[in-house]
């Protein structure tokens, strides 16, 4: 079976947004107009096709990024193949967003026209910047009370520091929103309400918008001609580019991430979705337009590139693992080069294992089709892989490559969890193991002293959902303890410690002497170890033992048993014995050396500080600020946003538990907040003593 669509006709993109900016609704409309789903699913009644896990339907937020394949005929009448990756917008799931951004070629950033650029929009935007993802902006919810397109344009500059190139102007706003002005063609599109937005009329631009349309068209052309010297010279001489030239220049600038074309509409009211789909074809890159993916040769560690062509060796990245009730475990993978055929064996170069490709599926949001082969640029779901987890590379065994690993943040919150019955015990272990394989930002460990199972994640909602999924998908009932903060310890003073480890018990003894300088690592939170041994006072082969010994103590710090960060250790001297020294002896010596040095290093407890943003009606500002101050918060500032006030604060995580309930009762349910981890900071002495009493 040959390739059906040329790679130039592929668009792999995601829709990224803040909670409630209308992401699922927009995706639904896209699926509806591209003919994949017959009944439009509304999030309001819990029936959207993309949100296929039960909880998502209840909470109305999207949790797992499902990949969907669909087709769209562009303005030129040619069919294009869209692979849409649904990304979550809730801050507890930013890991999912990062993961989907890795495998996208482009994205549509949704804004709520009423709120403009919201806190989570900034987070997701920064992540997309990190991976240099070309984006278009869709200003959604133009029918909402308080919708303001022009303020949203301004906020993209002021809050994101990005250049939006306005491609459409809204006709009317709020309940009067009727359609859009197309600034390339200079005409107006007005939707017919009675056809569910499937039909629209092309009319002249309303008189009251003509001057504004002219002004924004000029801005658009100025941005476009910057992308090409000849076009710029012609423009300066008064020669206007043709509409097709404008489109190709805007495409060039979008793919180069120089600016972001901006559109508007209301997905809920079915207005503006089709021009947005045309724009995906016109402006977002195909897999052939983005730089080749870089990796390292698994044998030689040399950097190599893989291009999006079918005759290069196969390489693909597993970016999501899901449990499907019918097929079992599904691994979603993006093929970067080569082609994949059912039944072949591939190498997992990260794990050093082989995998056999059994069933290959192309996914719609909740239905699936078996395929025999897939090509560069495709996104496929593979059933029954044994050892592959998120972020692994699968490739041709003859040309092993490791595509770059993704970085996953450390969890900031943990809770103890125990099964309700003996029967649940075994099932719980299996369930947690499966969920951890799906989600690298979720960790499971057993507390050695208490024997409790501890789960940790990115926030309260994250862990709530994990416990909820255990109950639904694995039928495991569990009791959950109070959340605990992931404290850290660090040192504040420097000290040189000399320690000799001697043990003589007949036969071979143990001997090692180390002299280590411990000091705070002021540059980062990492542990840095270096050896300044000269003249072989400690032989090279024993030095890793010294590092390992120090690291083993850092796993449980001396203050209250929390992991240590920000330590720099330098091995400056030592001694060994020809017979009695070993790596183990040096490991034991350096461990004891660090323990002896600890009381002199000024060990200090650190706590995670969260960046909190509360959006509240004016009436409650006083109570919200008072409450945040009472939580040891530091108010960073406040600003008006429409009729609401935005309060920014840095607050210790320890004081943010159950905040959502308090905020609700304080503001009669009208205020909302988001928080994300920002940095670690020393804990005040009185609080530190309480923590020490509780944990040490």
Curated annotation (Swiss-Prot):
Residues 8-288 form the tr-type G domain. Keywords: Cytoplasm, Elongation factor, GTP-binding, Nucleotide-binding, Protein biosynthesis. GO terms for molecular function: GTP binding; GTPase activity; translation elongation factor activity. GO terms for biological process: ribosome disassembly. SMART domains: EFG_C, EFG_IV. GTP binds at residues 17-24, 86-90, 140-143. It comes from the Bacteria. InterPro entries: EF-G-like_DII (IPR053905), EFG_II (IPR041095), EFG_III (IPR009022), EFG_III/V (IPR035647), EFG_IV (IPR047872), EFG_V (IPR035649), EFG_V-like (IPR000640), G_TR_CS (IPR031157). GO terms for cellular component: cytoplasm. The keyword GTP-binding applies. It is found in: Cytoplasm. It holds the Pfam family EF-G_D2. The keyword Nucleotide-binding applies. Its main location: cytoplasm. Belongs to the TRAFAC class translation factor GTPase superfamily. Classic translation factor GTPase family. EF-G/EF-2 subfamily. Catalyzes the GTP-dependent ribosomal translocation step during translation elongation. During this step, the ribosome changes from the pre-translocational (PRE) to the post-translocational (POST) state as the newly formed A-site-bound peptidyl-tRNA and P-site-bound deacylated tRNA move to the P and E sites, respectively. Catalyzes the coordinated movement of the two tRNA molecules, the mRNA and conformational changes in the ribosome. This is Elongation factor G. The gene is fusA.
């Amino acid at each position: 079976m040959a390739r059906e669509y040329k790679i130039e006709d592929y668009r792999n993109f995601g829709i990224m947004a803040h909670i409630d900016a209308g992401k699922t609704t927009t995706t639904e409309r896209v699926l509806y107009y591209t003919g994949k789903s017959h009944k439009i699913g509304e999030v309001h009644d819990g029936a959207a096709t993309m949100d296929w896990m039960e909880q998502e339907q209840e909470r109305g937020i999207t949790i797992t990024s499902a990949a969907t394949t669909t087709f769209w005929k562009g303005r030129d009448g040619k069919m294009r193949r869209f692979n849409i990756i649904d990304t979550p917008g809730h801050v507890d799931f930013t890991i999912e967003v990062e993961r989907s951004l890795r495998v996208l070629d482009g994205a549509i950033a949704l804004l709520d026209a009423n709120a403009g650029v919201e806190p989570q929009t900034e987070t997701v935007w920064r992540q997309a910047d990190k991976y240099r993802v070309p984006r278009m902006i869709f200003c959604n919810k133009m029918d909402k009370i308080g919708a303001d397109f022009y303020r949203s344009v301004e906020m993209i500059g002021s809050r994101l520091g990005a250049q939006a190139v306005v491609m459409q102007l809204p006709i009317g706003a709020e309940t009067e929103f009727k359609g859009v002005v197309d600034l390339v063609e200079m005409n107006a599109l007005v939707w017919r309400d009675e056809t569910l937005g499937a039909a629209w009329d092309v009319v002249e631009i309303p008189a009251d918008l003509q001057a504004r349309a002219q002004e924004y068209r000029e801005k658009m052309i100025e941005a476009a001609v910057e992308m090409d010297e000849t076009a710029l010279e012609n423009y300066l001489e008064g020669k206007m580019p043709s509409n097709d030239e404008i489109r190709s220049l805007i495409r060039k600038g979008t793919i180069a991430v120089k600016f972001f074309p901006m559109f508007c509409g209301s997905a809920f009211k079915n207005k503006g979705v089709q021009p947005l789909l045309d724009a995906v074809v016109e402006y977002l890159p195909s897999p052939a337009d983005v730089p080749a993916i870089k990796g390292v040769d698994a044998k030689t560690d040399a950097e190599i590139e893989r291009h999006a062509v079918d005759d290069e060796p196969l390489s693909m990245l597993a970016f999501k693992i899901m449990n499907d009730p019918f097929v079992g475990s599904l691994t979603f993978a993006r093929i970067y080069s080569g082609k994949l055929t059912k039944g072949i064996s591939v190498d997992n170069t990260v794990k050093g294992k082989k995998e056999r490709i059994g069933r290959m599926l192309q996914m719609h949001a909740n239905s699936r089709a078996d395929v025999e082969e897939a090509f560069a640029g495709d996104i496929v779901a593979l059933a029954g892989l044994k050892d592959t987890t998120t972020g692994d590379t699968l490739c041709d065994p003859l040309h092993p490559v490791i595509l770059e690993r993704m970085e996953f943040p450390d969890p900031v919150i943990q809770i103890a969890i125990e099964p309700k019955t003996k029967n649940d015990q075994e099932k719980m272990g299996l369930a947690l193991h499966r969920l951890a394989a799906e989600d690298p930002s979720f960790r499971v460990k057993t507390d050695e002293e208490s024997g409790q199972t501890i789960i940790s994640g990115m926030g309260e909602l994250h862990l709530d959902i994990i416990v909820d999924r255990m109950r639904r998908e694995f039928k495991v009932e569990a009791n959950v303890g109070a959340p605990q903060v992931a404290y850290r310890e660090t040192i504040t003073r420097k000290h040189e410690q000399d320690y000799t480890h001697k043990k003589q018990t007949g036969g071979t003894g143990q001997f090692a002497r180390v002299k280590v300088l411990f000091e705070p690592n002021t540059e980062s939170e990492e542990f840095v170890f270096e050896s300044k041994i000269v003249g072989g006072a400690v032989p090279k082969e024993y030095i890793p033992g010294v590092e390992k010994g120090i690291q083993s103590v850092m796993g449980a710090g001396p203050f209250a048993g929390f992991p240590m960060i920000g330590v720099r250790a330098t091995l400056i001297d030592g001694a060994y014995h020809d017979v009695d020294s070993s790596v183990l002896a040096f490991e034991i010596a350096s461990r004891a050396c660090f323990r002896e040095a600890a009381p002199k290093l000024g060990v200090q407890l650190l706590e995670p500080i969260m960046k909190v943003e509360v959006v509240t009606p004016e009436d409650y500002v006083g109570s919200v600020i008072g409450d945040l101050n009472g939580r040891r918060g530091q108010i960073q500032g406040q600003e008006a946003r429409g009729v609401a006030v935005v309060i920014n604060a840095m607050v210790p995580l320890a004081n943010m538990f159950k905040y959502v309930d308090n905020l609700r009762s304080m503001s009669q349910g009208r205020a909302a907040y988001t928080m994300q981890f920002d940095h670690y900071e020393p804990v005040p002495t009185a609080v530190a003593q309480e923590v020490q009493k509780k944990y040490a």
